Amino acid sequence: MDVFAFFNLNELAFGLSKLPMFPYFDMAHYIISVMSLREQPGALCVSQRSPLACWFSSMLYCFGGAVLSALMLADAPVAPLSNTTNLLLATLMWYLVFYCPLDVVYSLASLLPLRLVLTAMKEVTRTWKVLSGVSQAGSKYSDALFVMVAVGWAKGAGGGLISNFEQLVRGVWKPETNELLKMSYPTKVTLLGAVVFSLQQCRYLPIQTHHLTFIYTLFTVTNKTRMMLLGSSSHPLSSLESFLYKTLFVRPLTDLSAEHTHSKHNGSVPEPTTAQTHTKEAEASKKTN
């Protein structure tokens, strides 16, 4: 893009696209994921009652996206756990966050400056996960836009999308927390990334991959940092989401509502239903008796 050449950002964007995630960025992802689990209601009790269930829930938080995307592509769901090094690293982070003496690791990671850095690094890994999912789907189903979006979304936000299953591991059942019913910010921003990367891979967006990677990473990191510093849940997607909802999905008044309004204006009283008639007759018979 000419903008990148004008501001001499080509080398920075290309360098970011070649940045290795292991071990430091993966470690940040594991720490923040396990901390998110620990901060769930009742998670500490589960860690004392059943360390195995706590470990399994932590691995779902860390590798849920890879597991879900593997299922969608008819691959073995345990394939993401075949990397012993990553699995051991995630297990080490789980142990330190939950069982480190004096809670040293969790207390240090909870400090705002360090948590900002770790969260920013986790957002960088989100970009790579989304792009990896889109590319993986594109290699099997070329130009299948919907499949690429779905797999990229699953790989980037799978931990949230399978949260109901993860809750069952901890003995919790809250179907109202389904991410599809009420999506959290990470799920929304991951869906946005899956859409734009899929459009780029299908050549609907005239932009190079490393340029789009730089733009999306910059957007997610700066926005997440702003939200943490301000302690606010508002994000730039709220306005777009509200506009699309009001434009496409708000239903007009139903016929029943229209009839009710018309009767109210005319001063007419709607006829009682059969159940109401039976109730009144029963009350009248009681009074008579």
From Swiss-Prot:
Record flagged with keyword Membrane: yes
Lipid bilayer topology: Multi-pass membrane protein
Residue intervals passing through the bilayer: 19-36, 50-73, 86-103, 108-125, 145-162, 184-201, 211-230
GO MF terms, alphabetically ordered: identical protein binding; potassium channel activity
Activity control, per UniProt: Channel activity is activated by increased cytosolic Ca(2+) levels and blocked by luminal high Ca(2+) levels.
Quaternary data: Homotrimer; conformation seems to be controled by binding to diacylglycerol (DAG).
Function according to Swiss-Prot or TrEMBL: Intracellular monovalent cation channel required for maintenance of rapid intracellular calcium release. Acts as a potassium counter-ion channel that functions in synchronization with calcium release from intracellular stores. Activated by increased cytosolic Ca(2+) levels.
Protein name in UniProt: Trimeric intracellular cation channel type B
Organism: Danio rerio (Zebrafish)
